[in-house]
């Protein structure tokens, strides 16, 4: 199964494509669509739609995972984000993809074991789960990859994690995995 995770934004939209062909997670592609703030909002939505349509044609995912909308202090930003989400959802439906939406807290819980994890902790776990040599940048990308991984964990459940560096066997859960991989643990920022 191939899942496309999307972290939507009107100026920066992250994407991550993850597969589980052989029972292991594999990152197929990831990146960020950086949009020109000088263009109109509808023009940026059109660029997102076209770029993701090309990506879907190329990687042929079966599912699309997208972050749910949240309302912060800036209502105008929330409305613009909602329009981007709507375009991405419409594209997924048009292309016949199974669509799942996840709240940020649910994604963090699925990937790190903590619903209140920082973006840096999510990035660290994404890197560990996929056995990557370095953390993909920027955080919009790791958030999108985390959305794809969350979808796989919620809908497939029995996918193996790569072995932690220096371990001879798979651990008995997240606590042991983190203990065996101290170099992958990212501490939350102190305020």
UniProtKB/Swiss-Prot annotation:
Entry superkingdom: Bacteria
Enzyme Commission number, as recorded: 3.1.21.10
Obligatory cofactor(s): Mg(2+)
Record-linked InterPro entries: RNaseH-like_sf, RNaseH_sf, X-over_junc_endoDNase_Mg_BS, X-over_junc_endoDNase_RuvC
Its biological purpose: The RuvA-RuvB-RuvC complex processes Holliday junction (HJ) DNA during genetic recombination and DNA repair. Endonuclease that resolves HJ intermediates. Cleaves cruciform DNA by making single-stranded nicks across the HJ at symmetrical positions within the homologous arms, yielding a 5'-phosphate and a 3'-hydroxyl group; requires a central core of homology in the junction. The consensus cleavage sequence is 5'-(A/T)TT(C/G)-3'. Cleavage occurs on the 3'-side of the TT dinucleotide at the point of strand exchange.
Protein family according to the UniProt entry: Belongs to the RuvC family.
Entry protein name: Crossover junction endodeoxyribonuclease RuvC
Species: Chlorobium luteolum (strain DSM 273 / BCRC 81028 / 2530)
Originating gene: ruvC
